[in-house]
A protein has these predicted regions:
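His/Met- and acidic-residue-enriched segments that coordinate or traffic transition-metal cofactors
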Residues: 2-9, 14-171
Length: 171
């Protein structure tokens, strides 16, 4: 019995370095990025669905549908990369995002279109900078691949949002 306990102890001690090595390529900054990017992606999907319902212009409705499709895919890709290296992926919005969503959910028509489009330009400008920074700082190849593949999509979304903003007469 004593040798059995010692054997189990040896197995556990041997397993500790292996368990702690999993996810070693990520940093606290990677977790911060995943938190921000995941919540941002969730917000894009929720707001895209809202744009399809509450938007007035066909541009806003189409842009919303595009956001739902693209960000659902990007969320899955980022989530898979993050969890594969031991990072936690949030599944809900931050309190600030919930407040922003509630505000927009009470709007419709032209006022919704303007507010939504302005927010999409602002958010995608910020997202692009965040993803570009993360791409240059992360050391994990899986996370870097997910980030790198998202950047052209975010650039496209920013361009589309600016075009819609211009068409709608927003600043």
């Amino acid at each position: 019995m004593k040798s059995f306990v010692i054997s189990i102890g040896c197995v556990l001690i041997t397993a500790l370095p292996i368990a702690s090595a999993i996810g070693k390529d990520h940093s606290p900054e990677d977790q911060t990025f995943v938190n921000e990017a995941s919540r941002g992606g969730i917000m894009e999907v929720k707001l895209g669905e809202l744009a399809e319902r509450n938007g007035l212009s066909s541009e806003v409705k189409e842009f919303g549908a595009h956001m739902v499709k693209d960000h659902t895919r990007l969320n899955k890709e980022l989530g898979a990369a993050a969890t594969s290296i031991g990072l936690t992926v949030p599944s809900d919005l931050s309190e600030d995002q919930k407040t922003e969503y509630t505000k927009l959910s009470k709007m419709s028509g032209k006022s919704f279109d303007k507010e939504y489009t302005d927010l999409m330009v602002k958010d995608h400008t910020k997202d692009l900078a965040t993803f570009q920074k993360a791409e240059s700082t992360t050391q994990d190849p899986k996370l870097k691949t997910a980030i790198s593949s998202a950047i052209p999509v975010i650039q496209e979304h920013l361009s589309m949002a600016k075009s819609d903003e211009s068409k709608l007469g927003a600043p």
